[in-house]
Amino acid sequence: ESRGLGDVYKRQHLHGDHCFGLLGLISTFGLLGRTADLHIHSPEGLEELFAPMLAFFCKTLTYKVLFHEFETKEPALIYDDRSVTVTTIPLKHRIPCCGFLFEEKQRPNHIIRDMVDFYKVPVYELNRIKNGADFVTPEGEVIANSRLTRPSAPARKYAYCSDTMYLPKIAGQIKGVDLLFHESTFAQTEQARAKETYHTTAAQAAQLALDAEVKQLVIGHFSARYEDESVLLNEAAAIFPQTILAKENLCIDVDGGTAHEK
């Protein structure tokens, strides 16, 4: 079966703010004439919750909705295609919850056309050369792969962690990711409240980013008590300077480390 991430939706946990909008999205897709299957990955219980609502409100859907449930205690590979994998990150919240680690697969090297033409490399050899093979001429001369190709861009990694209390142990799984989104519900002055509600402070999110040696941190999921969210940004940036405050319609250049609004 061939599908892309655009046909796959992932629910971390079954609190209402993370799944109430799903029924409307499914219905809207139907109104827009969608025909491709929709795959929804979630902790156990979402299909049981949504099956009666889909049967009642979405009787005439033009596509299939397929549920895939995963365990939340250990990391699990839940998606794999030729370009990317998605693995769960076990988190700790009031109910079973996971984050997600998105990992691009390394693309083949880029062919240097002038060199390939110069050595008269046959077309049928190009895939092997893209994947690192040297080329041997009819005369037996070995042409190093480095003379025929240039490296493709490094594969990127993105980790999404919310909702959760501070979990230092996940630093190993998200080590060195290009971009980490981590919830920062409270300021450090509310650390006790954060622990009580199984959430994280901005300082704790920044410490995790520092320990995991990530390249960029985006903090979000802020408590409504903070009218000025810069207090959370300042708290995190004091520990991990490469911190960005999540905003609606924010676009982040993972490679360049910049952010702008649409």
Protein language model regions, located:
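Single conserved hydrophobic/aromatic residue that forms the stacking wall/gate
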Residues: 1-9
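A glycine-rich helix N-cap at a beta->alpha junction
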Residues: 57-70
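Metal-dependent phosphodiesterase/nuclease catalytic metal-binding core
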Residues: 71-219, 228-239, 255-262
